[in-house]
Amino acid sequence: HSLHILFADSIISIAERFQKIKNFQLLKAGGYMKTITREKYLERMIELNGTQDIKIITGIRRSGKSKLMQAYMEYLKSHFENINIIFIDFMDLAYEDIKEYHALHTYVEEHYRAGKTNYLFVDEVQMCPKFELAINSLYAKDKYDIYVTGSNAFLLSADLATLFTGRYIEIHVFPFSFREYCRYNEDIQDKDKLFDEYSIKGGLAGSYAYRTEKDRTNYIKEVYENIVTRDLIQKYALPDTLVLQRLSEFLMDNISNLTSSNKISQLLTANDTPTNHVTIGRYIKYLCNAFVFYDVKRYDIRGKKYLENSEKFYLCDSGIRYAAVSYTHLRAHETC
């Protein structure tokens, strides 16, 4: 058992930890770099430091998964000396030659350093076909502390148990919360104003780099469309993108309203998008698997059981709603 559990950080206060993190969430805003610490997620990774589990960072596109990984590596470098960090970013052409699971395995083994605590970080792991074979083999060697991130379409919560044979822990990253948005805009004290802004801009922090509403909206819309029209279509080989798009728009236009697959299929069919409740039920599951929507089931207090015939759905980020659905339409709908 060569993986050492590090205890030294337990005596360091949380405040001291975060003060030493210099590069947590870097964002270019108005021509300068602004930082914000996302304590909830970083603290979770610190808690899991040295455990045998594979740590899998999941979340919607552009929610900050890669930045979280980078921040944690900075934390390790600033707190421990006898460590060896093996970092692979498959978005970087420098790692093009190891986008094959045998090559990935060999590369990691070649960079292992005996006598040190070895950390393995793999960003955008899905770009290496059959990556799970390499990760599972490295996990079985019991000498690496492993962390991976990937596209939401390839690291779905429902698929993790199938992909990884060893123990794993999912660290789910959301877009900025309203609290984080306030901290990002700490120079503005009017919380009502900030809340109105946040309800429209949302928490996809990459959009804050743009000065105009049009550019911000285009950024968010592109993130959303990549998930719906590319990730899910590719993941599930869907034959009809129109039904998926109309379904997503319907759910966004009916946030927190009770609905069902039967009702949705009837409404879409009546509006020239023929479908059925089985397809709708399956597509809703796909959207939830990709972290675009979250479902809340009705609960029968008397019977103490969940009711299957109707649910409520909530969007992962309010900014997507305003970007994907006509802003004018939403305002008119909300004032009716």
Language model: regions and residue ranges:
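Structural recognition of the conserved hydrophobic beta-strand(s) that form the central parallel beta-sheet
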Residues: 145-151
